[in-house]
């Protein structure tokens, strides 16, 4: 972690690891696995959901190869089409009201000779207002490639310039750029994931990306499994209320963590003075231990009560500005 004043805090992981996923490989692997399991795979762009005379859903999409519209009659629709989900916009109440952070990153070729500041076994997170006024910037290793990026909800902020500055600061200014990518990251789960009939959302479309960290892959996969169970129950029973179980199950498992992380982001990411204190606070062994235990197990750690008490008073000192920076 790097503070606004360039002070660095290492947060080693004890008893576990954080896996960095190559989405270009992983996403295709998931699609191929679904196909092997019996799914019919079609490539195209979702257009809309129509209704036939019986009221059943008719999904219409544009075929990628022919560019012609294709219609598919279906009993259920699962919208997993990202943070700006067109399925959510068309079919779900409140689906157009999703706050998000815009993320942009550049995939770089890992230099043959690594810069002094770069460690291929370490994720670097920059909490600096000049790189992101309300989120963070990052250098994430992916073996032969590196992800250098940043996120912000401020529309007037030049995120591309910020990533350029980040690369120069990390000694990666001359690294080869393989591709550039941008995508919205939802800030909180939608209030409704289903239309009460035959449409359900999951993943980024449902808003299940962790605040503060922006972690989404684990939560999307967990949400996908819960959504699949809800769809199966709905199909077997014919009761559309079963669709609500997906959101209820997810929020029961992860809602409290999301709430805490949301508070953390809204307070500590506000300005450089608070970011400086936040990074300093993360130097504390109690904070590091409980942070990693919560992160690795995806739940708030309830044991070690004295560690929580110590953190409470340390947090209070930082909140009141009594702790030295």
Label each region the model flagged.
Residues 1-33, 54:
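A conserved beta-strand/loop capping segment in the N-terminal third of enzymes
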Residues 4-5, 51-58, 72, 193-197, ...:
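A short, glycine/Asx- and small/polar-enriched loop/turn
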Residues 15-19, 93, 216-217:
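Short glycine-enriched, charge-decorated loop/helix-capping segments at active-site entrances
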Residues 27, 101, 160-163, 260-261, ...:
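A general structural signal for well-ordered alpha-helical segments in protein cores
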Residues 33-176, 186-193, 207:
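Predominantly flavin-linked oxidoreductase catalytic cores and closely associated redox partners
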Residues 146, 189-258:
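Conserved mid-domain beta->alpha element of the FAD-binding
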Residues 174-181, 240-243:
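Flexible, glycine/charged-enriched surface loops at secondary-structure junctions
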Residues 232-325:
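C-terminal helical "tail/cap" subdomain of flavin- and related membrane-associated enzymes
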